[in-house]
Amino acid sequence: MAQAQQTNLMPVPTSVSLNKENYRLTDNFTIKITGLADKRLYKEASRFMQRLSEKTGLFFKTWEIPNVSHNPSAALKIHSIKKGVVQLDMEESYTLSVDNSEIKINAASDIGAIRGLETLLQLVESDPNGFYFQGAYISDNPRFAWRGLLLSQPYHFMPMDVIKRTLDAMAMVKMNVFHFYISDDQGYTIESKVFPTLHEKASGGNYFTHVQVAEIIEYADQRGIRVIPEIDLPGHSTAILTAFPELASNKRTYTLQDHWGVFDPTINPTQESTYVFLNTLLSEVASLFPDHYFHIGGDENTGNDWAKNQSIQAFMKKEGLQDAVALQNYFNKRIQKILKRSNKTIVGWDEILMKKMDDAKAKEYFEKGELDQLIETKVPKDIVVQSWRGIEALLASAKNGYKSILSKGYYIDLVQPTYYHYLNDPIPFLNKVIVPDSEANFNRFESEIIKKIQNGERILSPQEEKLIIGGEATMWTEHVSPETIDSRLWPRTAAIAERLWSPENIRDVDDMYRRLDIISIQLEWLGSTHIKNKQMMLRRLARTEDINVLENVVDYIEPVKGYKRNNANNFTKYSPYSLLVDVAAPDPSSLRKFNKLLDTLIINPSDILLEKLYQQLYLWDSNHDIIQKMAYKNLLLKDLLTHSTSLQVISSRSIELLNLKKKGLAASPEQIKQYKDLIKKSLVPAGYCELSLGLNLEKFILDYCQK
């Protein structure tokens, strides 16, 4: 079992055997590379030396790794059998051995060797005598070939420095697909030399040049990461239609959208000029991205503009296309032919495969196991389906011979707790914890198949399971800025990376959180701003450098989960994303540890643990007066004051009930009712933030005090 010995590694390797033969680090540490390797390995080995120097404070003579094989005294010997190619099913396996005399990394390709270097950096430990690599033998390879992260550009543009530090973090946790979401209703974000009007009119001034795109691809390739572009078609196309309104299905004035949601503007799929335009544009974009896969979107087409266009309706009747889904399939096939000429395989959201039907009919087919009834059978098999709406799309894809990747349950922009993502497995048999998302209606119905999965039954055959090639976390940027995006990405995405890399039996949530706290700090060392920006933003919010008392509140609240912020409909592209909700971190470590304390107290209400609880409650009680004074002249602290008030009230009442228990007295029914009412009131969100700890606090206090 990979988790039999406790390590700090994330993701957990396939096989780990620790030993006490630690390798002591000195200034003389050097690296030797042998075998066949691309230049990327030499660059990454040099970067490894720099990071190791920064981590240990050691003064190495050089960070550069010469492209020569002679260096018999090298401490780290890396051997690569072949030069790797960054593509689907790239060879990423490696073995790593550390003893007191040397370190060896042997890999099938230089990409595997790079994965081994990341593991080795996580083995650095220290004691009073200095730094060392933990003695170990590791054999490792990924469980899934597709381990991705989507980053959308049109909503809030993320500049080059954000992309590069995101790629650095992805490489650290062994993710290997960067999904570059280029276009939507809010913008088209790369330069077009064949249609310069596109980036001139439809980017809002925010776009990457061809040179910058090449820089991103090279940066990713060095780290063993594929870059896959997405141009969302035929819906989500307001930006394209702003530049080229003659391609639209409906005559109207088109301007870039600055709100969030699903809109009607749709490309006209019935006119040949559309395909002339898309042939030229997609061929240009395809030439920029060397990966064999190209994402065409295909999601959330309302069909409204098609329904209103008499010419489109006449075309559908002539071609025997019964509905908007059939027309979109016609469009997709035309796009597929265009991209095939560029040697591309299309990827699309699950709408490109699934039939449109009411929930009752879908439930009937799903419960009967007639999954072929859920899909459009005329869709070519050589596509990849990205499942975002529910497990039925994933199952139907695999059952009918389509490759698929899972994103449902990996929407990190919805700020769900880390365990929610961690326990969400791409293989349905293992997806025993299927968490319905009531905001998104991802699970549209309960069924016997869902119950079978939750009971651990296999729904797919081994061959069908192989068609599920991985998963992809999605970072939709409606409610983030370059300043806040890291706090939404990290460290939670590291847990998704582990789910996609590590063996299926690695599911210990407590141990995941233990290691996540460690990896979080290491991600900051690498350049992630998820920790330091939170403090900077809180200082700005408070207009002072003294933020300790504010942190005592902010560290225990969370942004509202799911689509609650989207549904408020008062945020746009130009709204401030520097408010309390933007400062608050998803699944904060302090809140988790407080809840863990309460869980432990229910089992073992020892004096030591009770004292810890008292200290925290006293802190919130006494903290409030200071915050009240700070908020008096600062309206930006209004929502924080609301949460501080809740904490002060429930803390003081909790102390009262605990003191009664200490005196051997019982709380009256009226006191219990008042306490419950206060807890309930504290759960009401303020400033799009929620204070959820009251539920666990109430559970312990009432359980303990009524015994």
Write out the residue ranges for each language-model feature.
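Contiguous, structured surface segment used for ligand recognition
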Residues: A4-F144, I496-V509, R514-G527
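Feature activates predominantly on carbohydrate-active enzymes
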Residues: K83-H295, N309, R334, I338, ...
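C-terminal functional modules
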Residues: D89-Y94, I469-S487, P491-K707
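Active-site-proximal loop/turn and secondary-structure-junction residues that shape catalytic pockets
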Residues: D184-Q186, V194, I231-S237, E300-T302, ...
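Active-site neighborhood of glycoside hydrolase catalytic domains
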Residues: F263-V384, W388-A396
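Conserved alpha/beta catalytic core and glycan-binding cleft of carbohydrate-active enzymes
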Residues: M354-M357, E364-K381, Q386-T529, I602-I608, ...
